Curated annotation (Swiss-Prot):
This is Putative cytochrome P450 136. Its cofactor is heme. The modification N-acetylalanine is found at A2. It comes from Mycobacterium tuberculosis (strain ATCC 25618 / H37Rv). Belongs to the cytochrome P450 family.
Length: 492
């Protein structure tokens, strides 16, 4: 039976509490409060063309160098809601790190995601994650993006997903049964989920059988974690030992690993995603180059395991906090039993779908969508010159009271007939993005998350570590529970 070693646990807790950050540094809550009540000098992004009838986008620079980073990383969607209420749907942030325009609300999101006139490019992501996820699918534009997406789509058709599901269920069933600690309030769900989704990705994406190549897989998985966090570095230099430098080194390791794996898998057989991408072609016979596969695999690994980890962690908390929903979901899982899973059986777990939607509404894994204007354009009547970084914020839109009833309340029934609150605006609910760049792995993620929660509910009752427990979130990248999310697993 898995157990927690006290020295390792205490060291982990010390790192979480005492590693300096905007979230745990003494006095930061007071600083945040002061900043929210400080009126900084305002400036215009640019003067609109004479006679255009457009309004200038107005904002401020915030603190020197840091801009509004403290408010953003501590408050996340709450800070954006503050901006939306006080400054409107289009706000300029003259940050020294990344100046840009916040596009707030579902109307702004519709313009950004639909991109009817192709005014918005994915190059807005480049300053943030470009060096680490170079030429990943999300960073490609227009015709080139569609060319790559058509080929990649073959790796996510239903028959392929069925094969991936069989593999991921093998990993989930073993880990949940053997590796997770029971009857212990020190058990942390977030790192356990992260390790599990990395194990799944190692098998389903890279073709490593569980328990094999342990040292190599551990090194590769650590590199993924480093690259994912590097995009939020304040000091962006390739000089050691800074986070940006560590991210660049990790990217180099990943490139070397996948370059070697592609050569192995080009003529091999297998149902893992890497082998599929090596052999997949579109209807015209087009295939990915070796470099394309390396770039796409590095991006897909990041996109798949981080979003799944965030969602599954939030769902575990909500089910522990709301026993009636936990039992409702368990009843559906019990009707299926412990037999092999397939797509059809997971589709019948409808209550888990509702809990998933409500969980990612309240804690949206991908809080923002980056774009950059390719020409002078307008957004909701505001003038945006060419080269402007524009950021939509679905995480904030998912909390708007004009769309969602009691938006901070956990209420999965809002997604059912006749309420259908997510349909009050076409872009009210966009956890997987929208338009031509909607997440290509959305169904894969949903199957993975439901597999994890199904196996978890079949074996355990989930309880909060204490009755009044509520998580605090770190919004420096995808939302992470700062304490690791302690949840007690009670064997049934």
């Amino acid at each position: 039976m898995a157990t927690i070693h006290p020295p390792a646990y205490l060291l982990d807790q010390a790192k979480r509490r005492f590693t300096p950050s905007f979230n745990n540094f003494p006095g930061m809550s007071l600083v945040e409060h002061m900043l929210l009540n400080t009126k900084f000098p305002e400036k215009k992004l640019a003067e609109p063309p004479p006679g255009s009838g457009l309004k200038p986008v107005v904002g401020d620079a915030g603190l020197p160098i840091l801009g509004h980073m403290i408010e953003m990383l501590r408050g996340g969607p709450d800070y954006l809601m503050f901006l939306y209420k006080t400054k409107g749907p289009v706000v300029f942030g003259d940050s020294a790190v990344l100046p840009g325009v916040a596009a707030l609300g579902p109307d702004a999101a519709q313009v950004i995601y639909s991109n009817r006139n192709k005014d918005y490019s994915q190059q807005g992501w480049v300053p943030v994650i470009g060096p680490f996820f170079h030429r990943g699918l999300m960073l490609l534009d227009f015709e080139e993006h569609m060319f790559h997406r058509r080929i990649m789509q073959e790796a996510f058709v239903r028959s392929r997903l069925a094969g991936y599901l069989e593999q991921m269920d093998r990993v989930v069933s073993r880990v949940v049964a053997d590796d997770w600690v029971v009857n212990d309030a020190r058990f942390l769900v977030y790192p356990a989920m992260k390790a599990l989704t990395l194990d799944i990705a190692s098998m389903v994406f890279m073709g490593h059988e569980p328990g094999t190549d342990h040292e190599l897989v551990t090194k590769v998985n650590k590199a993924f974690t480093i690259t994912t966090r590097a995009g939020n570095a304040v000091i962006r230099t390739s000089v050691p030992p800074f986070t940006w430098w560590r991210g660049l080194r990790a990217r180099e390791l990943l490139e070397n690993y996948f370059t070697a794996r592609v050569k192995e898998r080009r003529e091999a057989s297998g149902n893992d995603l890497l082998t599929v991408l090596c052999q997949t072609e579109d209807d015209d016979g087009n295939r990915f180059s070796d470099a394309d596969i390396v770039n796409h695999m590095i991006f897909l690994m990041m996109a798949a395991h981080d979003t799944s980890t965030s969602t599954a962690t939030t769902m575990a908390y909500q089910l522990a906090a709301h026993p009636e929903w936990q039992q409702r979901c368990r009843d559906e899982s019990d009707r299926h039993g412990d037999g092999p899973l397939d797509i059809e059986s997971l589709e019948q777990l409808e209550s888990l779908d509702l809990v998933m939607n409500e969980s990612i509404r309240l804690v949206t894994p991908v809080q923002w969508a980056m774009r950059q204007t390719v020409r002078d354009t307008e957004l909701l009547g505001y003038y945006l010159p060419k080269g402007t970084n524009v950021i939509a914020y679905p995480g904030m839109n998912h909390r708007l009271p004009e769309i969602w009833t009691d938006p901070l309340t956990f209420d999965p029934e809002r997604f059912t007939e006749p309420r259908n609150e997510h349909k009050r605006h076409r872009y009210a609910f966009t956890p997987f993005g929208g338009g031509v760049h909607k997440c290509i792995g959305m169904v894969f993620d949903q199957l993975e998350i439901k597999t994890i929660l199904h196996r978890l509910l079949r074996r355990y009752r989930l309880e909060l570590s204490r009755p009044d427990y509520q998580p605090r979130w770190d919004y420096s990248a995808m939302p992470i529970p700062m304490d690791g999310m302690p949840i007690v697993l009670r064997p049934r």
